[in-house]
Amino acid sequence: MSLFEGKKVIIIGDRDGIPGPAIEKCIEGTGAEVVFSSTECFVUTAAGAMDLENQKRVKTLTEKHGAENILVILGAAEGEAAGLAAETVTNGDPTFAGPLSNVQLGLRVYHAVEPEFKEEVNEEVYEEEIGMMEMVLEVDEIIEEMTDIRTEFCKFLD
């Protein structure tokens, strides 16, 4: 079964990384439904934490659709910011400031530059929408951070 098939996708893009609309275009035709997409400024939020409104939206959508049906795709420009966002949607808000404080959703979460994402989307669309950013991002650092968070906190490892 594919990563996207039948999933409800929450996209949290980054103004300095990969924006939400670029990730959305990549997901078209995968069998997933994008239920929320935004583009944030990760360095603008307090200590790089996930925006409180986005935390609320993630929580509400997870309650509506079920955690097992949710897939979160991030576009953060840095590994640390991606890790904080991934930790928030899996283990709860590490800053204890938002609606996901002490809420362990365990959601599936990937970054748009990870091989698991790239392998599932149209290669031409990926190159057009994300390829240039991939060249300037610290891809290995992002992959390592995301893998560590998933291994430790994700409840739905396929």
From Swiss-Prot:
Reactions mediated catalytically: acetyl phosphate + [thioredoxin]-disulfide + NH4(+) + H2O = [thioredoxin]-dithiol + glycine + phosphate + H(+); acetyl phosphate + methylamine + [thioredoxin]-disulfide + H2O = sarcosine + [thioredoxin]-dithiol + phosphate + H(+); acetyl phosphate + trimethylamine + [thioredoxin]-disulfide + H2O = glycine betaine + [thioredoxin]-dithiol + phosphate + H(+)
A molecular function (GO) term: glycine reductase activity
Pfam families in UniProt: GRDA
Enzyme Commission number(s) of this protein: 1.21.4.2, 1.21.4.3, 1.21.4.4
Active site, per annotation: 44
UniProt entry keywords in alphabetical sequence: Oxidoreductase, Selenocysteine
Record-level GO cellular component terms: glycine reductase complex
InterPro entries referenced in this protein's UniProt entry, alphabetically: GRDA
Recorded superkingdom: Bacteria
Function recorded in the entry: In the first step of glycine, betaine and sarcosine reductases, the substrate is bound to component PB via a Schiff base intermediate. Then the PB-activated substrate is nucleophilically attacked by the selenol anion of component PA to transform it to a carboxymethylated selenoether and the respective amine. By action of component PC, acetyl phosphate is formed, leaving component PA in its oxidized state. Finally component PA becomes reduced by the thioredoxin system to start a new catalytic cycle of reductive deamination.
Subunit and interaction comment: Monomer. Component of the glycine, sarcosine and betaine reductase complexes, together with components B and C.
Similarity annotation: Belongs to the GrdA family.
Name of the protein this chain belongs to: Glycine/sarcosine/betaine reductase complex component A
Organism: Clostridium botulinum (strain ATCC 19397 / Type A)
